Amino acid sequence: MVTGRSAQLCLALLFMSLDVILTATEKSVLTLDPPWIRIFTGEKVTLSCYGNNHLQMNSTTKWIHNGTVSEVNSSHLVIVSATVQDSGKYICQKQGLFKSKPVYLNVTQDWLLLQTSADMVLVHGSFDIRCHGWKNWNVRKVIYYRNDHAFNYSYESPVSIREATLNDSGTYHCKGYLRQVKYESDKFRIAVVKAYKCKYYWLQLIFPLLVAILFAVDTGLLLSTEEQFKSVLEIQKTGKYKKVETELLT
């Protein structure tokens, strides 16, 4: 029979197991500061890796660049003066969490660059674009194009696309003047996609949940059996003492 103490311990173990499972199903989050995934050589960018709470912020971080694990294990990876070799796929992973979604950084050399905060956005999401001049020179009379059609004449930068729709997908570029000379950036594709919903998402949680329940129940039963065994020993010991006392009296 499971005692009250064993039942409480069983529940405590179950909640602890569930907490571990829920934590392990969360992904690390990788961000850029400034937020642009396209930058010029010589520019600075800081990559930061976050967990789901402030305690994980100080935990060990694994950084992976183009499949190679970095020696850096802090929450921030700072690229002081970017080179073309810094281009590529970045992934981070906080201790106890899944790996982050990959971020693709493109480091290039040109006079004018169409910068963007993302190359893929979910419907109803948002992203920013900016027409960026070499060595941070001021860009004047900026025109933004999507699929070769002008859609924004902006003297303010950046331009924010909010509540993105599928119609916002396309190839973007910009034109503008640098020191009285007109330049055109290269083209870059930004995709707006629908969120993918897996019909069997619950299967990702039910198996570890069952394992946690079985672990907690087995532990509770083990402790309950141990307590019952101790009780039997006490009863046997008490019975022996009574038998000895009876023999001494007779």
From Swiss-Prot:
Induction: Exhibits night/day variations with an increased expression at night in the pineal gland. SMART domains: IG. This is High affinity immunoglobulin epsilon receptor subunit alpha. The chain crosses the membrane at residues 205-223. Residues 24-204 are extracellular. High-affinity receptor for immunoglobulin epsilon/IgE. Mediates IgE effector functions in myeloid cells. Upon IgE binding and antigen/allergen cross-linking initiates signaling pathways that lead to myeloid cell activation and differentiation. On mast cells, basophils and eosinophils stimulates the secretion of vasoactive amines, lipid mediators and cytokines that contribute to inflammatory response, tissue remodeling and cytotoxicity against microbes. Its main location: membrane. The keyword Membrane applies. It comes from the Eukaryota. It comes from Mus musculus (Mouse). One of its GO terms (molecular function) is IgE receptor activity.
